């Protein structure tokens, strides 16, 4: 019988340069918490004619499952990853970000008396203004990223993620967290072991997309 991993890490990829995806993948494979699997969901990328991503996944097939489908956006891609993962806990990583080596073990230690956590990040920006994003409830107001619930910092039990779906709306991460609060025990924690590259050249945000809000009709 196949071993059930403790943690499933879900990563949706759409036209992210391979060197950035590789950095993200390697940050998962180099965790000090080894009992994990990585589910790569290729959201119909068109920039990988040489199949670098698939080939790299095959090199680490004991840890990585590769799924490809037609482009439908981050939320639906992560939802599909949830359906195809096996872990008792589920984590998310954006394809242009990375974990510090202790990130997942940090998250596991925070799960006492919680079913779902959202953590702060170490945020890397080009400009000071990039630390601020439009408020979900009032787009004329800006809030610091430390005060946001970021899609990729969510970490929780399998039950939370299989009970709820990410919606194709702006601030899908905050909406998910709010819906989870109605049924589960939640915590916002200060870890700083998730490296969040915001509006850096080559990142999702730099490619005219707002992280966590890709729409799919």
Model-derived regions: residue spans:
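N-proximal low-complexity "stem/linker" segments adjacent to membrane-targeting elements
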Residues: 1-27
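A conserved acidic beta->alpha catalytic loop
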Residues: 42-51, 94
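Acidic donor-binding/catalytic loop of UDP-sugar-dependent glycosyltransferases
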Residues: 48, 97-110
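Glycine-rich, basic loop-to-helix element that forms the pyrophosphate-binding segment
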Residues: 69-85
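Short aromatic/hydrophobic "clamp" motif used to bind/position activated sugar donors
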Residues: 90
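Conserved nucleotide-sugar donor-binding catalytic segment
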Residues: 137-216
């Amino acid at each position: 019988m196949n071993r059930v991993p403790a943690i499933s890490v879900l990563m949706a990829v759409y036209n992210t340069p391979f060197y950035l995806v590789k950095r993200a993948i390697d940050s998962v494979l180099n965790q000090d918490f080894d009992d994990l699997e990585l589910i790569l969901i290729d959201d119909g990328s068109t920039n990988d004619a040489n199949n670098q991503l698939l080939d790299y996944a095959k090199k680490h097939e004991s840890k990585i499952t590769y799924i490809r489908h037609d482009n439908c956006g981050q939320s639906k891609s992560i939802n599909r990853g949830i359906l195809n993962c096996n872990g008792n806990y589920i984590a998310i990583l954006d394809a242009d970000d990375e974990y510090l080596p202790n990130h997942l073990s940090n998250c596991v230690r925070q799960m006492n008396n919680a079913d779902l956590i959202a953590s702060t990040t170490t945020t890397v920006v080009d400009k000071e203004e990039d630390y601020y994003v439009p408020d979900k409830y009032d787009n004329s107001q800006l809030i610091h990223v430390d005060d946001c619930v970021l899609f990729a910092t969510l970490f929780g039990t399998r039950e939370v993620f299989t009970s709820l779906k990410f919606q194709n709306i702006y601030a899908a991460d905050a909406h998910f967290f709010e819906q989870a609060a109605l049924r589960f025990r939640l915590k916002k924690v200060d870890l700083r072991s998730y490296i969040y590259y915001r509006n850096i050249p080559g990142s999702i945000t730099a490619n005219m997309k707002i992280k966590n809000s890709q729409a799919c009709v």
